[in-house]
UniProtKB/Swiss-Prot annotation:
Name of protein: Leucine-rich repeat-containing protein 51
A Pfam family per the record: LRR_9
Domain of life, per lineage: Eukaryota
InterPro entries, sorted: Leu-rich_rpt (IPR001611), LRR_dom_sf (IPR032675)
Note: LRRC51 and TOMT were originally considered as alternative reading frames, LRTOMT1 and LRTOMT2 of the same LRTOMT gene in primates.
Ranges: LRR repeats: 49-71, 80-101, 103-124
Entry keyword set: Cytoplasm, Leucine-rich repeat, Repeat
The encoding gene: LRRC51
Gene Ontology CC, one term: axoneme
Domain LRRCT, residue spans: 137-175
Cellular compartments annotated: Cytoplasm
Amino acid sequence: MNKRDYMNTSVQEPPLDYSFRSIHVIQDLVNEEPRTGLRPLKRSKSGKSLTQSLWLNNNVLNDLRDFNQVASQLLEHPENLAWIDLSFNDLTSIDPVLTTFFNLSVLYLHGNSIQRLGEVNKLAVLPRLRSLTLHGNPMEEEKGYRQYVLCTLSRITTFDFSGVTKADRTTAEVWKRMNIKPKKAWTKQNTL
């Protein structure tokens, strides 16, 4: 199967599902059997999964150390990963490793322990990110939570399982003008 055929078929493939496995560290995935669904996982000749979805929800992960290496061991084409579910873990930040998956379009991070709203800034480099969940994290309590995320990630179409409307975008832009100070352009006069 060539890469083009893989891209067309793997979206419909069942996810590589390690949810509800009490996994503490990413490296444990290598020795763990994924959950089985109604349809069997398709594998390459090398035994790696041909899916573009990785579900790690409802575990006890507190960091994503070695995520790239483990993804390479489990997936035939980790660079094509489009959906990662890390909901209901113990993550306290958005690990920069997630920003290396440029085909990522769905990212679930709800029900973790992410404190700082500024963590969302890391995700702005993901060109295909369309669906994001962050509710159930302490950051949700910060004033302007939804508006900040929508301003920072202007390409997302679904946030916290709700569609992003034109009214949401307008409200976010107004909020941005009222709350986020524009960066001053540095000029020689600033130093005088």
